[in-house]
Amino acid sequence: MTNIRKTHPLMKIVNNSFIDLPAPSNISSWWNFGSLLGICLILQILTGLFLAMHYTSDTMTAFSSVTHICRDVNYGWLIRYLHANGASMFFICLFLHVGRGLYYGSYMFMETWNIGVLLLFTVMATAFMGYVLPWGQMSFWGATVITNLLSAIPYIGTDLVEWIWGGFSVDKATLTRFFAFHFILPFIVAALAGVHLLFLHETGSNNPSGLSSDSDKIPFHPYYTIKDILGVLILILALSLLVLFSPDLLGDPDNYIPANPLNTPPHIKPEWYFLFAYAILRSIPNKLGGVLALVLSILVLALVPFLHTSKQRSMMFRPISQCLFWLLVADLFTLTWIGGQPVEHPFIIIGQLASILYFMLILVLMPIASLVENNLLKW
């Protein structure tokens, strides 16, 4: 009798994706982050669902409802902090996942990569709208500043902003629609992640060497299920330590002050995972230019496959490209630090130089380095 997992229409899909999937024998722990992102998404949807049962999306009661969740709901504080810090874990995994793709040339799978870039945009939009919901000072002013950027779009800008706000300022209508979008978007993310996997399984996974691994495949289960479980345990440990010992470490104290349209916080800044893009936005004195740079800071990832000039796929055997890659990582850390600093000397010039270097590395220096390496290897 044939095994049910190979014949049943639904079980067959699961089997071909997670059990009998042929995987390269040499993929390292950098390939764990896909499954970790899946776990993060499930955690966020579940904790978010329980939070939504107690949250009210009204400007008068939103802040109080979050306080009520933390004080009066059984383990409400735990659910709330798991959700808030789960977002940070989500982004850590996302950045490492994208970094892995850049380093090992996974972007050569064009469909998978482009869906991934779309996923990154969607997750960022979801996180931004989620940050507005507690209706603290940073929620309100963050929403005001970021939505206001759309007014830089010529001709339709002002109308567009007022349309998004549902009025002439960030108010009840804005909060209600942000809650609605924040609820629906994770399910769109889950659907896109399914498409992401669908395209990945058309080609099979890449591997650290960047060479074809068709001649040496092993079944996903038990080898990579066990390996992924280790990653999941480390993720759960890290998240638990964060939630139980310093839940507010990555948050902003200003968000414990209820939203007040009459009082602007001294330093408006987003959550830590947006600071690099925020620094790029602020480094350009022109409003429209800043908005374009902000969008391009993520959209530039979609150009990476077209900028691949090397004869080799992976950076594993390309020392010059490796140096530039780690310079890019250091640059992103610098941008993240600058994004959290006030707009004054010397932070302004550091931010501008780091922003220029960011785009230079991706668009100019890395493709040139690849060509140099080709010539050094007489290719």
Swiss-Prot record:
BP GO terms, sorted: mitochondrial electron transport, ubiquinol to cytochrome c
A Pfam cross-reference name: Cytochrome_B
Domain of life of the source: Eukaryota
Annotated transmembrane regions: 33-53, 77-98, 113-133, 178-198, 226-246, 288-308, 320-340, 347-367
Assigned keywords, A-Z: Electron transport, Heme, Iron, Membrane, Metal-binding, Mitochondrion, Mitochondrion inner membrane, Respiratory chain, Transmembrane, Transmembrane helix, Transport, Ubiquinone
Signal peptide location: none
Keyword Transport carried by entry: yes
Membrane association type: Multi-pass membrane protein
Cofactors: heme b
Role: Component of the ubiquinol-cytochrome c reductase complex (complex III or cytochrome b-c1 complex) that is part of the mitochondrial respiratory chain. The b-c1 complex mediates electron transfer from ubiquinol to cytochrome c. Contributes to the generation of a proton gradient across the mitochondrial membrane that is then used for ATP synthesis.
Other notes: Heme 1 (or BL or b562) is low-potential and absorbs at about 562 nm, and heme 2 (or BH or b566) is high-potential and absorbs at about 566 nm.
Protein name: Cytochrome b
Gene (UniProt): MT-CYB
